[in-house]
Amino acid sequence: MIALLSPAKTLDLTKPNLDIETSKPIFISEAEVIMNNLKELEIQDLCPLMKISEDLGVQTFTKIQDWNTIYYGDEKPFVLSFKGEAYRGLDADDFTKEDLEFCNDSLRILSGLYGALKPLDGTKAYRLEMGTKISIDGSKNLYDFWGNKIMEAVLKDLENHKEKVIINLASNEYYKSIKKIEKKVRVITPVFKERKGIEYKVVTVYAKKARGQMVRYITKNRITKSEDIKNFDLDGYEFNERLSEGDTWVFTRD
């Protein structure tokens, strides 16, 4: 069983006091191709392409120009660097070395630049969303550039797991890059809803955090069987069998 999560736009590169070796992303060669294309762009090209302000464009331009493929094994792990809502829910800062190692086996972080990241892959500062409309070496967009590579990498990792199931906690933008995996293995998609009057509705900011909390729950409880995630109970959520349908598992809270 492997869970999928989207990356965050914000990165914190402050190094933690942690004695654990980081790894080089498996698609570093592909990332280099993408970055070489981005290095040719000026700030005035990046801003409309990435839909960012000029100030953020300057920061992004610097990150792109500084990016390289040199790894020393002591970089900050991506799972500790990402700082979006999902990663606030995951809250990996208090993970033990054993937690991080389990998480490294059971989670893959989808990425526009790196394809698929392991949590303990070393961080290089970047900004590139999967939905960015950029052509790389003749491809139509990043989905076209990545093709089946991300799916094949995750399937290969899944071979080492007893249960061949994907827990999809990624956003639609990122899951689209691996959606064909549904034809190969079972995919369970948890959905998190809040009570609003007499109904339950998805509230984006809470749903993002809950996705990270689900990864935390899987990690801390060493869950390897998908059925066990139905016991997820962090922050008042509980599995709602009535609202769930097929492999779309709904978790609600009042």
Curated annotation (Swiss-Prot):
The lineage of its organism: Bacteria, Bacillati, Bacillota, Clostridia, Eubacteriales. PANTHER family: PEROXIDE STRESS RESISTANCE PROTEIN YAAA, PEROXIDE STRESS RESPONSE PROTEIN YAAA. It comes from the Bacteria. InterPro entries: YaaA (IPR005583). GO terms for biological process: response to hydroperoxide. This is UPF0246 protein CPF_2407. Belongs to the UPF0246 family. It comes from Clostridium perfringens (strain ATCC 13124 / DSM 756 / JCM 1290 / NCIMB 6125 / NCTC 8237 / Type A). It holds the Pfam family H2O2_YaaD. One of its GO terms (cellular component) is cytosol.
